[in-house]
Design a protein with these regions (language model features):
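Short glycine/proline-enriched coil/turn segments at helix->beta-strand junctions
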Residues: 31-32, 51-55, 86, 249-254, ...
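Active-site Asp-x-Gly
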Residues: 206-209, 214-272
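An alpha-helical support segment within catalytic cores of ATP-dependent transferases
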Residues: 14-34, 110, 124-129, 137-210, ...
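Conserved catalytic motifs of the protein kinase core domain
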Residues: 52, 101, 204-206, 226
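ATP/Mg2+ or Mg2+-diphosphate-binding catalytic cores
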Residues: 2-13, 170-171, 175-177, 258, ...
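ATP-binding pocket architecture of kinase catalytic cores
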Residues: 35-156
Length: 308
């Protein structure tokens, strides 16, 4: 459902900025800081300089530049979210360029990624339900600013969404058909794809998505494991909200849905598109990500039980 990961300048120079340059850039935006306390490159496309354990300079790494990722897009999304204090995200303090390097200055998200700690049982369900409430608020924002921005790729009409779902399902069916040992379900890939497409309603809500609000970008407090918030909106795009269900098990996804529906239930039309999007996501993962295939098949089995 996303643009491909084609790096447009893979041979570009990728300098690590010295501390003096980092401090100078951040101070241009009215931030008082004294030292770079950590440099983080785990995000791949960006390099993050942490200052005084409170602020972040996030720079686009030139060799990792790709069409779907944009710091301008992240700054835009975070600015829109600043009107909603219940949705906890970093606060943008500045966005610009230094020489040929694009950057954002922002506050550091407190806590740690779920991926780095063990969150299980009741605590995991609580985190997922709070994340679901957060995503419902995020998806419920006015969409005109996102639809009107060229920064956000994706599907802006039902016809575009259905065409993309059909094309991606067809590709997944083709790949799985060429390697039949991948498929261990009673229903054939083609029949499952047909059932999913037939269930899509005439009305589909399409909104700006985070893109990957999974364990790597969902933050919790390390001592209590309480939910804190979300980071990294640079891959955002427009499509169906279900494509923001980026968690490893179907039980995780159901808990997230419970939180999503806490204040206002979703419609039958939403649920039909939700199932379709999850089947698409899982069939695509089965076709392209061998390391997750056992888990993906388990999710698909659970999903099949919810399909009429």
């Amino acid at each position: 459902m996303l643009p491909s990961d084609m790096y447009s300048q893979s041979n570009a120079v990728d300098p690590v900025l010295d501390e003096r340059t980092v401090l100078d850039i951040v101070r241009r935006h009215g931030v008082r800081c004294s030292a770079v306390t950590r440099i983080d490159e785990t995000g791949g496309e960006a390099r993050v300089y942490v200052l005084d354990h409170n602020f972040v300079l996030k720079v686009q790494r030139p060799p990792q530049l790709r069409p779907r990722t944009s710091l301008a897009k992240e700054a835009f999304f975070l600015d829109q979210l600043s009107a909603y204090p219940d949705i906890v995200v970093p606060q943008v303090l500045g966005y610009s360029r230094h020489d040929n390097i694009e950057y954002i200055v922002m506050t550091q998200m407190p806590g740690v990624p779920v991926l780095t700690v063990e969150v299980t049982g009741v605590q995991r369900m609580a985190v997922l339900q709070q994340l679901g409430r957060t995503l419902r608020g995020l998806h419920s924002m006015p969409q005109a600013p996102f639809y009107g921005s060229a920064l956000f790729p994706g599907n802006r009409t039902r016809e575009e969404f259905v065409a993309r779902v059909r094309a991606n399902l067809a590709h997944a069916v083709q790949v799985i058909g060429a390697t039949p040992h991948l498929w261990r379900l009673d229903v054939s890939p083609a029949d499952l794809a047909s059932r999913v497409l037939a269930a899509l309603s005439a009305s589909v809500d399409l909104v700006a998505l985070h893109s990957n609000p999974g364990p790597v970008h969902t933050f919790v407090r390390p001592d209590t494991l309480d939910f804190v918030g979300l980071i990294d909106f640079g891959d955002a795009y427009i499509s169906h909200p279900a494509l923001d269900w980026r968690w490893p098990t179907h039980a995780d996804r159901v808990a997230l849905l419970q939180g999503y529906c806490d204040d206002t239930p979703v419609t039958d039309e939403f649920m039909a598109a939700w199932r379709a999007a999850l089947v698409l996501s899982d069939m695509s993962a089965l076709a392209t990500r061998p390391e997750t295939r056992p888990q993906t098949l388990e999710r698909l089995r659970d999903l099949l039980m919810t399909l009429a």
